Amino acid sequence: MSATPSRYVVGIDLGTTNCSLAYVDTGAGEDARPVDLSIPQVVQPGVVEERPLLPSFLYLPGPNELPAGSLKLPWDAGRDYAVGEFARQQGSLVPTRLVSSAKSWLCHPGIDRRAAVLPWKAPDNARKISPLEASVRYLKHLVEAWNFRMAKDRAEYRLEQQDIILTVPASFDAAARELTVEAARAAGLEHITLLEEPQSAFYAWIEASHDAWRKQVEVGDAVLICDVGGGTTDLTLIAVGEETGQLALTRVAVGDHILLGGDNMDLALAHSAAQTFLAKNIKLDAAQMMMLGHSCRAAKEKLFADPSLASAPVTVLGRGSKVIAGTIKGELSRAEMEKVLIGGFFPDCPPDAEPTKQRAVGLQELGLLYASDPAITKHLAAFLTRQAQALAERVQPKRGKKKPVGDGGAVQRRRLQGGAAAPARADGAQSLAQGAHAQGAGERRSGPGGGARGGVLRHGAARQGRAHPRRGGPRVLRRH
């Protein structure tokens, strides 16, 4: 971070499917609270609106595909690509011009991540960019949006001058971390600290629980963080020890980069709804399936937000001249939602369960390695089985009780036996901003090469420093 504390501490969640930004005004002192930045973006040709999230999609239109000025932004009238909501919508119609999952491509060891390979499988004559450049453009959009909203008349408030906490998956290797920092610097950000996403969730839980966290964890415990995001699932295991009379937290294990998350759940709900339409002789095309996925996501969120609802509507626009008249309507019942989500993604399984692996047949095509088994509980069981030795060495088998210490990600199970899946608010960037401020943003580094402090990871560095959260937090969070 910067040698001199900045006015704002900013958290950026550079997600697989959505990006977000939140900040804390350090001038507010103890009354400081994280604030989400509404992000201006193109939502229709020529229409810019503010949204709480920036979808991690980038659209590269073909020649004469859109009218002149369709992609202009308040700060750039000549923009020739789209990032965000319109990119996602238009990409559903022309997928060969849509860049998605850039974050997962950024950690793919089988490709040159600086090479222009995205959109994947696009024709040779199509516009392409690298996974690195896609990350640069997402971050650049956030920088431009911040400066437009927050720093029109104050150069010292520009995002380039603020202390930035930028998340990375715990499963990112050193190369992917270095590329993330390279992308941030290319977007103009210099005062960067990388923070692993599960650790961000853990810090946010500590801050939110105040001193109550001490009653939930003690020496000899293990804390399992299961971060189910929009496109990936990240698993981290933290052991609770003691050092000079204070609790010490050591990260002992990290899971694989599992391409499985909330988007998969929405897609599964869409396929279930499509079968209902098919039974009525209504067959949806690819674009309508994309619309159905968005509608199912909205219906799912309504059902989670209001437990009294038995169902929520889903709609898909018809095709042809009479679009409104041809609107396809249906509903997603709570029973069907629970059946799909719990049965498909959170089924009961034995402790030694293993996710089903797709059988390799002949030559395998290069691409993203999506999880072949959607059961997150099986991936979790396999992770814990692999870490049995580490658990045996560091965790004391006492008390015989298991305690959830927090929730997060896309969905959590309310009950282990057939209960409803409850929504868990994923605070994302807001957690980062709050956690960073709670730690004082405090032990700072100067310039690109400084050491990492405050329990965060310097780009690719294998060491971590002391953490000093407010209200007597853990003394150390380090890697084993």
Locate the predicted segments by residue:
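Acidic, glycine/GT-rich loop-and beta-edge segments that sit at the periphery of enzyme/chaperone cores
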Residues: 3-6, 14-16, 37, 217-220, ...
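Acidic low-complexity intrinsically disordered segments
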Residues: 190, 318-390, 464-480
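Phosphate-binding loop and its immediate beta->loop->alpha context
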Residues: 34-186, 196, 267-312, 317, ...
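Glycine-rich phosphate-binding loops at beta-strand->alpha-helix junctions
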Residues: 164-179, 291, 317-322, 329-330, ...
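Conserved phosphate-binding catalytic cores of ATP/NTP-utilizing and phosphoryl-transfer enzymes
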Residues: 1-7, 194-226, 388, 394-399, ...
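Conserved phosphate-binding/catalytic loops in two-lobed NTP-binding clefts
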Residues: 187-200, 369, 425-452
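Gly/Thr-rich phosphate-binding beta-strand-loop-beta motif of the actin/hexokinase/Hsp70
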Residues: 2-32, 102, 210-251, 296, ...
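Phosphate/ATP-binding catalytic cores across multiple sugar-kinase/actin-like superfamilies
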Residues: 137-156, 204-216, 344-405, 424, ...
